Amino acid sequence: MTTLADLTTLRVGGPIAEYVRVSTTDSLLEAVRAADASGGPLLVVGGGSDLLASDAPFEGTVVDVQPFGEIASIIDEGPSGSVLVRAGAGTVWDQFVSWTLSHGLSGVEALSGIPGTVGASPVQNVGAYGHEVAETISSVEAYDRLTGNVMRLAPAELGFAYRSSAIKRSVGQPGLGDRPWGPTGRWVVLSVDFRLERSPLSAPVMYAELARRLGVEAGERADASLVRSTVLDLRRGKGMVLDPGDHDTWSAGSFFTNPILPEAAAATLPEGAPRFGAGEGLVKTSAAWLIDHAGCGKGFHLPEAGDPPCASLSTKHVLALTNRGNATGADIEALARAVRERVYDAFGVTLVPEPVTVGIAW
């Protein structure tokens, strides 16, 4: 029997009642409609890289979305160098980024190395090194589970926010019958259109560490291919590029989002805590800094996790919770709760987990 541990980068999760593997838009639609007709819960999985599942059986349907064929295609190109590109939901995200550069296009190179699929990118509004995918998304083709229609969602309808979207926020809202949406939300992504630029130069480099490595000032542009290779090097150094032989990469990536606090709450943080403007009256701080300064450094683990531990923070990056080889969903959940409690006790800040959860409520 297929388990969620087989489908997630954390490699934890219980058995699946109904497992369906799809590799076309039509088969994806058919599987989702059948699952909704059955009355059970639905989980659509791409790379499984932003998912934490409990060890309990999932009494519903899991739809495992595979690549649809070609990585992407150019839909339209304007005289100013603006290029519209379409990629199917099952396309591996990093293969898409590589494809854009091989076709002389820039705009998503700073998002190199992020695991998962194109279909998941707008749901989470994936981001890294000063950029978010929302900056380049022109529209999303999605199946509306409420109306049964395929529709195209514009950015205004997608409601992008920090590591969030209207699709993600629909989870838990009233859904079919008397059941809330979840674990997959109201809309199932079928394809994504991106507005990119035909240029050898990257989007402006906005992340200080990346700018230093590239030898440019923040806000300047650099060779797009060099940005990609540098980002991949940085991510590897933090255990953020999937490697089956490296347990530091058996994770869901950055597990907690950076807290966005009212100015008054941010003012109570220690003087050394990072602070970034996040809109009127709001301040963003660093989850990694809070975790580290709450006594949860690299490699932190609970005593009951064993020796060597079955689950710990990455030895390279405190934001990643990792499976050291034989962890269960309960082990990862316990570690996450312990880190949250320590940060709250130290700073009065409640960290928000980023991954989609199955059978776990915070």
Segments predicted by a language model, with ranges:
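Residues at alpha-helix termini
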Residues: 37, 102, 293, 345-346
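Phosphate/pyrophosphate- and phosphate-bearing ligand-binding catalytic cores of soluble enzymes
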Residues: 5-9, 47, 51, 150-330, ...
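Anion-binding (especially nucleotide phosphate/pyrophosphate-binding) glycine-rich loop
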Residues: 1-147
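Weak global preference for isoleucine
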Residues: 16, 71-75, 114, 137, ...
